[in-house]
């Protein structure tokens, strides 16, 4: 059900009429696909990258926000709180790494306490439970490494941390299992109204072949490019600005420096630089917030990374920045209205936007999926899918098992005793599972996002060749076709004796 080339697409009936075509396989598009798969609907997801979770969804703060920052009455406020509420059940059913570690918005000596009081008022209005302002004595007992300048903080116990890769993969895999077709390496070039449906012309980025889709309903979940697709079919133009955020990821030795997610008072550019543990035990610092013209500008900068350390120190002291193991940047899709843009386009019947999904987009994704599905119900006759499977198991992690369980597993499946990634203790069996499960990995980064092989201290310096050998054997595919992250990122280009 996951196709990566036009030849496979033809075999799967890519010229068929779909009830629903979703553009974008990030967390929002994948969540919508999963929600729609609860119904008897012929749906597909069209994604230009070689894998799901390859845009904003792979480069963000990995936070499930409480919902106290959004302006009451906005979609951000409503959908953040609902999405937060849904996370416990989703994490259980779809095996998503998720933890309610709570969040703190700190106020320093040179800041007005009224900022926290306004956030408390907003959060209460939005229906966020358990909010309270706590003073320094209690704060330091909770977080000993807070800056000496911190005087008080807003505590949100429902705030959490999640793995955005696994969250997106879980939605996508479950949707795929329930019959949604995913077309990867498929770039949308044009969308045109064609009677009662839409004609979507695409280019396969790997083969350069062109293909056409027809769909009664189109859902636009294309991140920073959502305005481009909206503006193809509507006179009600959107303008989305790419807002770049740079991050530093620290080694697991630094992962206990804080236990809660530490925010600073938000500004018009966002929630500011945070310091947070991750569900996998690292420490994350970021993001910056700089508007850029280039919707592909995911490069990091020396000035941006330098500013992170200085800004983060205002809330948390002694951050061991020498333990940074990697840095990265992501783009948030900021729409001029400063709110999510979700709904059927007035002058383009059957075209539904899920646009402008910046923070708290990850937190809101499950609720956005519900909202969009309700809109589709008003356009198409949807009946419940009697065969819907609502659960999914993630990749088995031998290092979470007891010694007795691990020995039994290795005796039955020896590949789980062969360590490939020493930093993260990832086995050959886990990588094989990542390749063979629905929407299986076909690149080094695809394996990395599913298993964490290559995410540790050496950043794939040791395990890359061994992971490539497993990809070559299990897909199977030529070593020359294996990429880091899709078209144009091939690892091996020739034999050394021939160069």
Task: Give the role of each language-model region.
Residues 18-44:
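N-terminal Rossmann-like FAD-binding beta1-loop-alpha1 element of flavoenzymes
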Residues 296, 427-438, 461-479:
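Iron-sulfur (Fe-S) cluster-binding segments and ferredoxin-like electron-carrier domains
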Residues 38-58:
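Glycine-rich FAD pyrophosphate-binding loop
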Residues 270, 279-280, 296-419, 426-439, ...:
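C-terminal catalytic lobe of FAD-dependent flavoproteins
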Residues 78-81, 106-115, 155-173, 183, ...:
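Short beta-strand to alpha-helix junction loop
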Residues 62-142, 272-273:
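Dinucleotide-binding Rossmann-like beta1-alpha1 core, especially the glycine-rich loop
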Residues 31, 191-196, 200-286, 290-301, ...:
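Flavin-dependent oxidoreductases
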Residues 154-216:
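Helical element adjacent to the flavin cofactor pocket in flavoenzyme catalytic cores
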